Structures are given as C-alpha cells and as structure tokens.
C-alpha cells in the first residue's frame, strides 16, 4: 500500500510540475507577442508626441494666424490620431498590465513614455483612450489558472505524512515476551496392571460347558481358589499361579460337577508384576487362550471384547515393560 501511495504522489507531482511549466511557457509567449504588437502603437504615440511638440514650438514662436491655425487644426489632428489609434491599444494594454505581477523582469517604462511628452492641450485626447476598459474581463481567466496550479503540490504531501504516521510504531516493534513452554510432566509409570483377554463364542452362539471344561484342563488350568481355574508354574498345580481363568457370566465361578451348561465365553487375566518373567508368562497365557478357542470353536478377544490384533498385543507388552521398569 505504501508503494502504491508513493507512486500516486510521484504521478501527481509530475503532472503539477508539467502544468506549471506549460502555463509559464504559455504566459511567456503571450507576453512576448503582446510586446511585439505594442511596438507599432508606441511608434505611433511617439510620432504623435513629436507632432504635438512641433505644434507647441510653433505656438510659442508664431503670432496671429499661426495661433488660430493651430487651434483650428488641433481637433483635426486629434481626430486623425484617434482614428489612427485603433482599439487594439486597449486590447493589448490589459494583458501587459496583468503580466507585470508575474513577470517583474519586464521593463514597463515604455508604457509611461507618452505621459511625459504629452502637453496640456493633448490631455482631453488621452482621456478617451483609458476610459473604454470593459475589455479587462478577458484577462480574468488567466489569474485563476495560476492559483489552482500550486494547490495539488501543497495538498499532495499531506496524505503522504498521514500515511507514514502509522508506520512509526511498526518500524520499531517491541519484541513480545516469549512464554516459556511449561515443563512437560512425565506420566507416572504404573507399578501394577492387569492383562485381560477373552475367549468367546461367535456372535449369536454359546460355548458348550463339557467341551469347555475339557479344553481348560488340557491347557494346564487347575480348579482352585475362588472357584475358578488357575495356571501354575508347574502343570501339576505346584508353584505360584501365573494367570487365572473365570466365567464370563457373573459371578464368574465354575462348578466342575456340572456337565450340562453353556456360557458365552471365559476371561483369562494376569496380574503384573507376577512370579518369574512377565513377558514369558504373557506368551504362555496367549497360547492357552488360543488353544481353548481352537478346541471350542471360539475367538480370542481383547479386554474391550474386540478382535485381538497385533497392535493390541504390542500394547500389552509395552504395559508389562512399563510395570517392570517401575518396579526395578
């Protein structure tokens, strides 16, 4: 925007300068032409003054009829001079007079020569020369042209100053204080977690109880505390429990004597930390779940009861590592 405004100011200034040059050139030519046109008139005036001077000399030296002859012929001579002096005298005199304030270098004394040699009887002859001055309005359109020319030159810098005023605070912007980033608090590591996975029947069906119990026992689970099945360190049930298996239906318990029952699925869970290597225990847990699902015709699901995916398995492993690091 500043560049556009600067370009506009340059164009306006150039136009104003060109207008002033054209106006000055036009005025100079007009004044020069008026001076050339006034020269024949001045010669006529000087000739007329010489005639008047000769008549005055004759009047002073002559007597009688010569004086009467001068009085009788003076009006005739005045009429001849008035006829010889055309009206352009009034048309040229105003432009020369109006040009004086603009061109003080011009020599106006030439216009003042006739009054010095004009005698007293010739004064009534010069009065009608200055009386018809209604033709001066022709010079009126010249004077208003000079006034509006400098106006755009003085008015042009004003918007430039206004345009640069708002740029002062922008020139030296103060650096804003940069807010230091708040220290990121490390998420506290979990010291314990529970890994859960499910073995469920397909949608709209349930698992057979007798087939389910046989597959659970084949996977190494033994019925024990809380009426649920546990997988111990040793397949014969000795050693600490690594993970457990419960019924998906509340209260989650089993009755080994019941053969005729059905369930939508079972839940296998492992508490971390646990005995031994938790990652190896997790692999054994996943193998047991996959064995039971294959035997009963079910599927392995995650803790949200969604299809188990490799991404979810890696998430479980990351949780186990986090707990191990927190308890190291």
From Swiss-Prot:
Residues 43-64, 77-186 are annotated as: Disordered. InterPro entries: Cell_div_ZipA (IPR011919), ZipA_FtsZ-bd_C (IPR007449), ZipA_FtsZ-bd_C_sf (IPR036765). Residues 99-115, 123-171 have a biased composition (Low complexity). Residues 28-328 are cytoplasmic. Pfam families: ZipA_C. The chain crosses the membrane at residues 7-27. Keywords: Cell cycle, Cell division, Cell inner membrane, Cell membrane, Membrane, Transmembrane, Transmembrane helix. The keyword Cell cycle applies. Gene3D superfamilies: ZipA, C-terminal FtsZ-binding domain (3.30.1400.10). One of its GO terms (cellular component) is plasma membrane. Residues 51-63 have a biased composition (Acidic residues). It comes from the Bacteria. Belongs to the ZipA family. HAMAP family: ZipA. Interacts with FtsZ via their C-terminal domains. This is Cell division protein ZipA. It comes from Shigella boydii serotype 18 (strain CDC 3083-94 / BS512). The lineage of its organism: Bacteria, Pseudomonadati, Pseudomonadota, Gammaproteobacteria, Enterobacterales.
